[in-house]
Amino acid sequence: MSDKNSRIAIVSADKCKPKKCRQECKRSCPVVKTGKLCIEVTPTSKIAFISEILCIGCGICVKKCPFDAIQIINLPTNLEAHVTHRYSANSFKLHRLPTPRPGQVLGLVGTNGIGKSTALKILAGKQKPNLGRFDDPPEWQEIIKYFRGSELQNYFTKMLEDDIKAIIKPQYVDNIPRAIKGPVQKVGELLKLRMEKSPEDVKRYIKILQLENVLKRDIEKLSGGELQRFAIGMSCVQEADVYMFDEPSSYLDVKQRLNAAQIIRSLLAPTKYVICVEHDLSVLDYLSDFVCIIYGVPSVYGVVTLPASVREGINIFLDGHIPAENLRFRTEALQFRIADATEDLQNDSASRAFSYPSLKKTQGDFVLNVEEGEFSDSEILVMMGENGTGKTTLIKLLAGALKPDEGQDIPKLNVSMKPQKIAPKFPGTVRQLFFKKIRGQFLNPQFQTDVVKPLRIDDIIDQEVQHLSGGELQRVAIVLALGIPADIYLIDEPSAYLDSEQRIICSKVIRRFILHNKKTAFIVEHDFIMATYLADKVIVFEGIPSKNAHARAPESLLTGCNRFLKNLNVTFRRDPNSFRPRINKLDSQMDKEQKSSGNYFFLDNTGI
């Protein structure tokens, strides 16, 4: 599609039925009346064809179509003008740039592969923007002239005069141990090497990030969450003018996410810039002062919008429509009505109930006590608790992979499990993997419609499993876990590496699958928005991480979330437009009111 097309025509293959209508779209089109072939369709054709080059965007066919099969979407006409960077011919291009403001946190929100990391690289001075001229890149003088009149002009001028030092916390923290060469490998020593702030500040960072216990450990012995906290700490102990954090919340539990957000906010000063890319929308909301959305087509083009306030920006992203540019970048809005979830549930009297006894498990110094509980078919139980409180241990106990110390054995049930860490060892393509492991389900049309299609597996079906990115692997792992016939599905952190949009789709897929097939799912999830969307019941884990923990019996979403948030000392409210949970700022009026009334998690009437 050339950039000159200012609109895009969509004809839904499912809805368009030329055999059953009188081709109203073609008859009513003013361009066809002048003798041009703008819409081509006959009673025998399978689907109508609309020429985007000839289309004038009048929208008459959209109104006339009896099946609502046509959409005409206006694309931004200025896409050609605002190219900031293009890697090479026929490759990804980025339009415009986010504008950081001193003394404020800028949040970036958008799907994977749409240019967020490219934008960070350019703002950090690691990539020189070529304004789309990849064959003869412009000089800095010309680049600054191009951005004149905007806040970016001052920013790049400062950067050229070496006045700006930028630090990026990388997106994939798993690669950090390999990148650190040299004799110094201990966490504490590495932090000391980079330390440019006062010892009091550094002590405070170490305390809030809970790094005291790992200071003497080697960097390669750290878990994912510890590496993430170490990476945030490394960025914070250095003096810089621009701090950039690429996905600071992956691997962290809810409490650590909020601590990380507080630390990132504490870096602000009147002359400092802080930029943050984050897919957990509740953390992004808590963290940012204003946001830029990046929309477009993944690995084709990305467009950065003008800055908007946090609430406005996240709602625009969920809605998929930008009022300022009168542009729709997603066909449907992403909604968080917990009512959606329960409407699918038919009151089935024939649902089976299962129960498990109270259990105790000791692993080294760690002791986990589990209260007895019960669950039934078509039910999703979300486990909430900090890292290191035994959620994965309970999953393994239920799966029969671990034996309890005392208490009865767990009744034998078929179990399918998606582990937290996914290591691809399979030597073949995704299709071969599915055929080997879940052939029956994979060929089942219902499974294709419910799970495979919405997770967009078709885009990666013929790629080598070992070459997939984190998010692609996660989607494959979810399909594999759901494809194995079982009574109970145990899913550990389904949101890791997925972007905000995929997280919501993934929640819907898991939910629909569990309800339709009358199964039970136990899910560990730290993204609070996703957890509340998925949960029918909640199991709260309390105690001291890595020492002793107590898993309570399953309870309702409201009482469970209230108990969990009370332990964290955090309150949530609901956004009136999109119904998503939003974190109240600490000691704000809402925060104090909700704490005094004991309502930590708010399910107001509009959301039910």
UniProtKB/Swiss-Prot annotation:
Residues bearing PTM Phosphoserine: S349
GO biological process: positive regulation of translation; ribosomal large subunit biogenesis; ribosomal subunit export from nucleus; ribosome disassembly; rRNA processing; translational initiation; translational termination
Keyword Electron transport recorded: no
Listed SUPFAM superfamilies: 4Fe-4S ferredoxins (SSF54862), P-loop containing nucleoside triphosphate hydrolases (SSF52540)
Ranges where the ABC transporter domain occurs: 70-320, 345-568
Top-level taxon of origin: Eukaryota
Keyword Disulfide bond belongs to the record: no
The protein's name: Translation initiation factor RLI1
Taxonomic source organism: Saccharomyces cerevisiae (strain ATCC 204508 / S288c)
Record gene name: RLI1
